[in-house]
Structures are given as C-alpha cells and as structure tokens.
C-alpha cells in the first residue's frame, strides 16, 4: 500500500479552491457527463473536458465526489491544470482506540479502477499542474497515480494525496 501526502497552503493564486470556491472560467467535468458516484466510468467525460480546452491550455475542475476511471486521464496539451476542490482527508475520532485517526472522506477523488494510471501526462507537455486531489488505486493497488511519460517541463503537483496505489508518481525523463 502506498500513501503520498503533499500539502500546500491555500492562497489567492489557487482561488481558494481547496476551500470549495472557484470563480475563474473553468471547465467542470460534470458538464461533460462525469458523475462522482464511485461507480460510473468518467474517463471519457474528463478527457472530453481536456479536449475542449483551447490550444493554449486551461483549467479542468474536478468537484467533490469519487470519479472512477477505467482509462487514464490523458493530458496532451500544454498549460493544462487539473484542479480538485480539496483532497478529502478527514479525521476519525474512535472513542475505543487510536486506530484509523485519519482517512479518506469527501473531497475530489479519482479512482483508477481499471486504468493503468489515473493521470497520464504525455511526452513533451509543459506547464501541467495537478492540485487538490486524492488519487486512489481502488481495491487492487496495481496502478500508477500520476505518470509523466517523458520529457515534460515545469510540471507542478500540489496538495495531492495518493492511497492504495502501486506507484504514486512516476516521472520519466523530466527536465
């Protein structure tokens, strides 16, 4: 089992998305048919949201919910930001013991059910940002969370939590 926690503070540059607000003109994946119910494959809908971005890139918002992926989210444009509202960790108070005091709950979550990677950044992409998400391998723990496939430049990962993954982040030939 793999757990990766990268934390950053929220500030005006992120439009306070980790607190649940966004005011930029952004593409919300639910407008493309993604359903965060933990059952429905959302791969095509999220990839359609990315495809709809202009050639210079843009922001794709993953709202709260469990968005299942049977194929990877493929980033094949420069300056694409995948932005969740928050990574969804909560504390659990167990009056009978101190086990499991922190666990997943709520937030923006990608579940790589049958995808080899939840997010795949294609070779040569520049300015990719992925933030405020939980990435899960589902029940199998055989997946990669975020895969930079080759010479990518200026990629930023911020406020990402990975759970139940074989490999959290795989970076190949980065500059």
Residues covered by each model-derived region:
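C-terminal motif of bacterial Sec signal peptides marking the signal peptidase cleavage site
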Residues: 6-9
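N-terminal extracellular ligand-recognition/capping segment immediately after the signal peptide
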Residues: 47-50, 54-100, 107-115, 134-135
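A short, polar/charged loop/turn motif at coil->beta-strand junctions and beta-hairpin connectors
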Residues: 21-28, 104-106, 124, 129
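Right-handed parallel beta-helix/beta-solenoid
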Residues: 14-45
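Glycine-rich beta-solenoid repeat tracts in large extracellular/virion proteins
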Residues: 72-76, 89-102, 117-124, 142-151, ...
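Right-handed parallel beta-helix
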Residues: 79-85, 126-137, 153-166, 175
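Short, histidine-centered active-site or binding-site loop motifs used for metal coordination
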Residues: 31-35, 114, 134, 139, ...
